Amino acid sequence: GRLTAVHCSDLPRTKGTHGEVGLYDMPGDVIRAHVAAGWTYHSRICIWKDPVVEMQRTKALGLLYKQLQKDSTRSRQGMPDYVLVFRKTPSDEKAADPVGQDARQFPVSQWQKWADPVWMDINQTNVLNVRAAKEDKDEKHLCPLQLDLIERAIRLWSNEGDTVLSPFMGIGSEGFMALRCNRRFIGSELKETYFRQAVKNLRAHDDETVFGDLFSQVA
């Protein structure tokens, strides 16, 4: 039982590569693949992203002000991220424990905020340091996931002591936050430089925990 959460976005199509300028519906592919594999499409969260930052980073034609002045029929909105959530119905023999939220730690005001279909307050710069994992050919597409987004997913959909699985671990952001939220973690990653950085990040969390406990005892 339980859930899987997939972070994704639409993909840009370019004239040089695809013969046209537009967007490709990657989230739709993710939904169809999960449903075909027996998962239930459960929820979609839209993650707001600053279109000015996107324009400065990508120089996308549809976001340029000069394009608006020239021909606004080719202007478009910025591209948000999405978290797609899928639920697997458990069998009688393998039903997962429910995840119950304590009202003292998860008040109704917080739920009203997190139940919003658009999360406007995710800090896009709240990510693990990735400089050690960068290679020249990767710099354009390396995009670690925001830690506050990961924390919300872990707190919403798992209990303390549960195991969080990340089959595409990258530099270990999900694992870092899983440990910080008192969960266990299993991750896999094909790229060796990313894997080594993930190990460093997870060890850094362990060191941080050890030294934090030590200093609290001394204090």
Feature map (PLM): residue ranges:
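Generic C-terminal helix-cap and adjacent flexible tail
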Residues: 204-211
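Core catalytic lobe of class I
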Residues: 1-197, 201-204, 219
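Acidic, low-complexity intrinsically disordered tails
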Residues: 211-219
